[in-house]
């Protein structure tokens, strides 16, 4: 992947802006800012899928946002002509989307979205051609900047950066939208290059424009570092600075305090403590959604997030690439030592004394030692897979679980794992005899279809398939994988959809493969990717 251009759109930042003198809170104004943001993002987002004019130009919203923003998200209609073509070609493959978005036309979908909002009853007095089209641009970003120290009533200040072609027309149009929404309070509006900046107060908007002129987010070292880590630019870009963790903890705590969901016997917030634990080492994050080489792709990177069940220190998960080439779907995850401890503490904090009592009853019923036997059972990691030879119609006619080619492959101490399985089968009684268990080396396979369970012990060549390698690019070091091959076994997905309505069947036909994976690189940066390819 090529490195990302720092001038591309992104998410939220951290340069403080001055407060106005304290006065009455203006919650309604916050609603208008958010409302305008949502409407604009919706319009631009829809346009990103359908606009067919391929000229690009202008700077990204990050050039109009002050450096150090703590969070930022942007939508870009002009990432590149290539991505626009990819988006149109991919979405045209799905009949329902082609019909819904009218992708075959060259209409301005921003008009379509605006007029659909009007149909809901808002701003019917406005005309798109007269009040919006003359000034609206192709890029927009929503950002959060930290409030100045000592501001008791707010932690962040919202900022909407909207690309415009005419500053005066934009101000007039925005005021008209605000008026038709029934808000008499004036939004803060300021100019910053090709953008208008909207915030709750005029002083904030002016200060943000001045700050961006002095130091823009697009040139911020942390911002560009995270954009580089996330790969090529795209239509939607997201960014969270290190400082965003503290805001997230505060918001989670405030939510609990508002709802009364506090730690028993204390004023501490349960959710706040959980979020704080998850973000304790957080150093930043970024994400991009793009259209690339016939695929829809979302890529994310972060550092310092709690890894929970994911592989720690670059730990690789089970070798999914050695599953049978006929695999239709698989979910795989690596489990680090002590992975269950965090979950146990969470449940204990939620259930209190009832948790330990429930655990004791479960031990008595199953003969297991909990939670130790659960960790032993799942080993170092496991994969759950189903083969494309699954005969759905046959099962409908004659249900027999022994003919379901699905199973679990566990990696770890085979003797210890099978011992726990034996305990579970003994507790379940004779009906558990249908469960097939096999082991070979450090692999244990479990399922109902004897032939498939045996197959799971062999080394397959799923990793050699183009469908797999295209959507799981880092299979060799992935700690978690979800893979679906829609074309496996002569198109099992189409066969499954055969009984659905014609449009649903037609929408399944273009699907090729879906991959979701996560891994950690040598710098301990955590990566995640979702990729959906089409035929």
Predicted regions and their residues:
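Active-site proximal loops enriched in glycine and acidic residues that flank catalytic Cys/His/Asp
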Residues: 300-302, 333-335, 412, 439, ...
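Terminal targeting segments of Actinobacterial cell-envelope proteins
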Residues: 1-29
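Structural boundary/hinge residues at secondary-structure and domain interfaces
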Residues: 3, 23-156, 164, 175-182, ...
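Generic recognition of long tandem-repeat/solenoid scaffolds
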Residues: 198-199, 298-300, 443-448, 526-532
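Long, C-terminal catalytic modules of enzymes
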Residues: 456, 460-535
């Amino acid at each position: 992947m090529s490195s990302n251009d720092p001038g591309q759109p992104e998410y939220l930042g951290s340069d403080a802006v001055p407060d106005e003198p304290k006065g009455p809170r203006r919650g309604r104004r916050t609603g208008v800012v958010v409302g305008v943001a949502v409407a604009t993002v919706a319009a631009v987002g829809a346009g990103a899928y359908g606009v067919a004019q391929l000229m690009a130009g202008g700077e990204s919203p990050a050039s109009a946002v002050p450096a150090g923003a703590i969070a930022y998200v942007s939508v870009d209609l002009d990432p590149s002509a290539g991505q626009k073509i990819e988006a149109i070609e991919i979405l045209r493959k799905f009949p329902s989307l082609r019909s819904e978005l009218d992708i075959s036309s060259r209409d301005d979908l921003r008009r379509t979205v605006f007029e659909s909002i009007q149909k809901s009853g808002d701003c019917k007095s406005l005309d798109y051609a007269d009040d919006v089209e003359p000034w609206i641009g192709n890029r927009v970003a929503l950002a959060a900047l930290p409030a100045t120290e000592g501001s008791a009533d707010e932690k962040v200040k919202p900022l909407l950066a909207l690309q415009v072609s005419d500053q005066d027309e934009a101000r007039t149009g925005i005021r008209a939208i605000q008026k038709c929404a029934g808000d008499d309070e004036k939004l803060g509006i300021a100019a910053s290059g090709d953008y208008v900046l909207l915030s709750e107060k005029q002083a904030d908007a002016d200060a943000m424009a001045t700050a961006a002129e002095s130091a823009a987010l697009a040139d911020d070292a942390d911002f560009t570092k995270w954009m580089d880590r996330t790969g090529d630019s795209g239509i939607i870009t997201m960014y969270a600075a290190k400082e965003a963790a503290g805001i997230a903890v505060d918001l989670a705590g405030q939510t609990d305090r508002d709802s009364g969901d506090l730690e028993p016997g204390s004023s501490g917030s349960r959710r706040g403590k959980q979020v704080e634990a998850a973000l304790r080492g957080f150093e930043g994050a970024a994400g991009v959604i793009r259209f690339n080489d016939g695929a829809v792709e979302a890529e994310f990177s972060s550092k310092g997030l709690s890894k929970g069940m994911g592989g720690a220190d670059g730990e690789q998960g089970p070798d999914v690439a050695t599953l049978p080439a006929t695999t239709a779907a698989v979910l795989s995850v690596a489990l680090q030592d002590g992975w269950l401890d965090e979950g146990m503490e969470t449940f204990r904090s939620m259930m209190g004394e009832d948790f330990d009592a429930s655990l004791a009853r479960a031990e008595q019923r199953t003969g297991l030692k909990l939670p130790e036997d659960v960790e032993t059972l799942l080993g170092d990691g496991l994969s759950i897979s189903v083969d494309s030879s699954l005969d759905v119609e046959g099962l409908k006619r004659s249900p027999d679980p022994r003919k379901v080619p699905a199973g679990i492959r566990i990696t770890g101490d085979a003797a210890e794992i099978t011992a726990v399985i034996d305990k579970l089968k003994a507790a379940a009684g004779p009906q558990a005899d249908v469960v097939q268990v096999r082991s070979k080396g450090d692999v244990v396979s479990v399922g109902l279809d004897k032939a498939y369970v045996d197959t799971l012990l062999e080394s397959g060549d799923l990793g050699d398939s183009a469908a797999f390698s295209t959507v799981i690019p880092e299979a060799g070091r992935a700690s978690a994988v979800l893979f679906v091959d829609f074309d496996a076994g002569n198109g099992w997905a189409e066969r499954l959809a055969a009984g659905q309505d014609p449009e649903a069947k037609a929408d399944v036909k273009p699907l090729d493969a879906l991959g979701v994976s996560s891994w950690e690189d040598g710098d301990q940066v955590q990566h995640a990717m979702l990729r959906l390819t089409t035929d």
